[in-house]
Design a protein with these regions (language model features):
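Short aromatic/hydrophobic "clamp" motif used to bind/position activated sugar donors
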Residues: 79
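Conserved donor nucleotide-binding strand/loop of the catalytic core
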Residues: 45-65, 69, 73
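Acidic helix N-cap motif at the loop->helix transition within catalytic regions
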Residues: 16-19, 41-50, 91
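A conserved acidic beta->alpha catalytic loop
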Residues: 24, 36-45, 59, 83-86
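Short beta-strand/loop segment that forms part of the nucleotide-sugar
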Residues: 9, 30-38, 55, 84
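Short, well-formed alpha-helical segments that are part of the catalytic scaffolds
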Residues: 8-27
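Catalytic-site signature of metal-activated, phosphate-bearing donor transferases
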Residues: 65-71, 89-216
Length: 352
């Protein structure tokens, strides 16, 4: 089956990632467009071996301009946007075709799995991102952290599609800092030209996290949350959780407690419930912490892998162990399955 979908990518100095990315796409038989924005490594050479078309675009400090140029080069109206460090994990082509036939004016949301570490154990955070759309109705806007809008400037409806990507996302510390410094300049320009919005403040917060300036990240998240932000917005939900974890990292536990004031608005997410459990635990309010962690385990879905199961149970077990209630601790450590920190604690308790 060859679907009328063109994969459109922009790239610069991505020879560490682009080959794996393009190899994973090959079985799908999508048309592949690569637009290079000034590579000095082997990116173009590799792209020419795998892609159907390779173009050059003079970088102008505008991601949307580069993205929109890439989709103009496609042979198909349906375009799938991916980055070079995103590797295809799962796809159902029959369901994908059916979904596009039903949703011609909407944006398809892929699943992107992002690796991260917690308590020294590698885990996954999953998110839905709008990446598939018909170029007759939509395009990109925004010079940085570009977003999909309809051609008349509205936010399009969305639909879920059976496409999952793994986000490798590894960048050296120096490369991460260089990228964050560049992005900061573009984000501040966007803020000045377009005015404040939850989206821009959230991205500024994330950018300052990349620059290891958590105080600045907190400041921008606070500004975003003061804009009467929609609690049903995925960006706003992520901003609340980012804000909370930054406060915990900064040991500002008393300020983090203020998130109780918006509990009702955000309590539909396991991620927020788990965060509240962490906040109560850091403040020594252990009964409330256990209550929130237990509540998190009642949710069927979450963004950060394990917070509705083994991570929540591990924290409950840790609290019971610290309180000297070893039987309860053992019970909850066992609920963590093969989660390495829990297995280790069970062995240490048995040996004590």
């Amino acid at each position: 089956m060859m679907l009328p979908i063109s994969v459109c990518m922009i790239a610069k100095n991505e020879d560490n990632h682009i080959e794996e990315c393009l190899k994973r796409l090959k079985p799908c038989r999508f048309e592949v467009i690569v637009v290079d924005t000034g590579s000095v490594d082997r990116t173009v050479e590799i792209a020419q071996r795998y892609a159907d078309k390779v173009f050059h675009f003079a970088w102008c400090n505008d991601f949307s301009a580069a993205r929109n140029f890439s989709i103009q080069q496609a042979s198909n109206d349906w375009v799938l946007i991916i980055d070079c460090d995103e590797y295809l994990e799962n796809v159902n082509l029959a369901e994908l075709e059916e979904a596009t036939n039903r949703n011609s004016h909407s944006v398809g949301m892929i699943v992107r799995n992002n690796p991260y570490s917690i308590q020294g154990v590698r885990s996954i955070m999953s998110e839905r991102i709008g990446r598939l759309f018909n170029r007759r109705y939509c395009h990109f806007e925004g010079i940085i952290h570009e977003q999909v809008f309809t051609l008349d400037g509205r936010e399009p409806d969305s639909f879920q599609i059976p496409l999952t990507f793994y986000h490798e996302g590894y960048v050296s510390e120096s490369g991460k800092r260089m990228r964050a410094t560049r992005n900061l300049e573009l984000l501040l320009h966007d803020l000045e030209s377009k005015g404040p919005s939850p989206f821009i403040y959230y991205q500024l917060g994330q950018n300052y996290i990349s620059l290891n300036d958590l105080d600045k990240a907190v400041q921008y998240c606070q500004k975003g949350l003061k804009l009467n932000a929609d609690p049903n917005s995925a960006i706003v939900q992520s901003m609340v959780e980012t804000y909370g974890y930054c406060l915990l990292e900064l040991a500002k536990y008393d300020i983090a407690m203020e998130l109780q004031d918006i509990y009702t608005q955000f309590s539909q997410r396991a991620d927020f419930i788990y965060l509240m459990g962490m906040i109560y635990m850091k403040n020594g309010i252990y009964d409330k912490a256990i209550e929130e962690f237990r509540k998190a385990t009642t949710f069927s879905t979450c963004s950060r892998k394990g917070i509705n199961s083994y991570q929540a149970n591990y924290n409950i077990a840790s609290i019971y162990e610290n309180m000297g209630e070893l039987e309860e601790a053992r019970t909850y450590y066992k609920k963590c399955g093969d989660y390495a920190p829990a297995v280790r604690r069970l062995k240490e308790i048995a040996a004590s």
